[in-house]
Amino acid sequence: GWLSYTYSKTQLRERDERGINAINGGKWYDASYDKPHDAKLVANYKFTHRVSISANADYSTGRPITVPVAKYEYGGGYRLYYSDRNSYRIPDYMRFDVALNIEPTHKNDAFTHFSFSIGVYNVTGRKNVYSVYFDTDAQGQIQGHQLCIFGAPIPYVNFNFKF
């Protein structure tokens, strides 16, 4: 197995020659793809030369987003006033996967080789947030909505054939 960790910071700044209309007033802000912390842990264990199990844990900081912080009335309707660019983050991403791997033919001199795996992605069923969007309801209240992908454990069967 192995363990990896990465720390990185990605920021942007827009400069306007006149000093007006620049994003965040010309100050640095986190890029949409900024993920300061990213860690992965992979573990494998062989019971025999044909049967093994594997596990994978994945963690990363949530992506930066811009959120509405207030509302105001304009032209007979409500408009949203937003925070500084990317000053908030969606929840962190975490996932844990497991698999049972079987290699029935394990001869190095064989012309063909096949194996299969049975496993589960996202064993914990964590609802990792992919995107967040905002709107206002009929009373003008700001409503936040989270779009989650793979919000449940996903079983799989994999068959590999090599020649």
Regions found by a protein language model. Give the residues of each.
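Flexible, solvent-exposed coil segments and beta strand-coil junctions
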Residues: 15-24, 74-82, 136-141
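Extracellular loop and loop/strand-boundary signature of outer-membrane beta-barrel proteins
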Residues: 24-29, 83-87, 142-147
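Gram-negative outer-membrane beta-barrel transporters
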Residues: 1-67
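Generic detector of contiguous secondary-structure segments
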Residues: 40, 46-48, 77-88, 105
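Transmembrane beta-barrel architecture of outer-membrane proteins
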Residues: 6, 30, 34-40, 93-99, ...
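C-terminal beta-signal and adjacent terminal beta-strands/loops
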Residues: 50, 59-76, 95, 102-163
